[in-house]
């Protein structure tokens, strides 16, 4: 990375070598004393001289590393500690605030690479996808005390579809061997204990990328929409619902706002989560990618999925041989779960927009069976108004538009019963007022202070302005923490009221 400093190849094992130098030097001085029998005073003076050099070395060392703590006494943690010295903005970042409520992410890159008029990632290439929309960075992640958790070279992309136009953008941070030969993966668990979902429950100790999801209007207007949604989904039985971690994000030392970190939803991420050996065995496609961005990056996978959709929508769902074919190509239970939880979350940006599916080659292992499965993602617009909740239910259960397969599945009486049973069970497990209130309390406790800081920062205009083409802000556009509290109360009330609306739809027949 020619425009960034290179990380050193050594770690804090250097302190051990300083100590060894002290011992060896002391012995050397004693053995080479002018007298065959050196006096105690001479020996002490020689040792003190060497000891002074040792102390000076330590002072120089720790002046570089800013007296930060080491995350744990392991070679990996010591190396991260030593690399964190190369975050030239860290001192100013930590001096700018009395405390941090969550993680701190510091990104360094050449300013022209990010903001150049012709080729800047954030100024000119924010609609580019793939490697064309990626630039080299150095990324540092710290905990609240300033302990470095991640320090390495990586790639940066804009995350999202139409939201790429927003002033405040979301990012995907990607580890690659070409950027950092010593660290081709991230190795610190930012989500406190993720494990594989294949039944082995192995700790996920390495991963290829993570998302920095921005908090802004008019998307995740409260700052907790996504975290509340994913937390409720996990309680409802959606095992792959993303964990979220609040963070303050800085680029070249400048505060960008309140964000939260979450695992990526890519073929690499699926391989890590489901313990799939070869990511090449995985097929992932965003069904409406072309409608949202103008291009479809995986047309052959989309064609395969739409062939299955066409088969399903025209199948006789009472024929046992047809059911066998369906179940060989679709994880029906997971599909019904996916629809049920989206309806209970009141997701208003889903059926005709955020639809992503995946499957893995049949390797005879859990989740490696050739069956299509659905992603739960992008929960910015959950907690919809009553009318939209009812409309969503009717569209999801009755209309085949937008490649919707639920109506076809519900033609099978057993699937229909399973679907309604899932809704009732989810309501009991996750969507009672008590559970909803506990989730809100937890997520707000984690995010409140960072959002409060954000609202007082220069980055706040990025929170308010959705598009780079937005009109200049006026006084009426600004919101306060009191306004945000009203939004949170509305959000909470919509979620609490949704189960009764869904139950009424079920009772009226569908």
Region roles according to the model:
Residues 18-43:
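Short, Lys/Arg-enriched N-terminal segments with co-localized hydrophobic residues
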Residues 64-73:
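Sec-dependent signal peptide cleavage junction
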Residues 80-85, 89-95, 100-129, 137-138, ...:
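Middle-to-C-terminal accessory/interaction subdomains
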Residues 133-292:
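Conserved ATP-binding subdomain of kinase catalytic cores across diverse folds
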Residues 43-55:
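N-terminal Sec-pathway targeting helices
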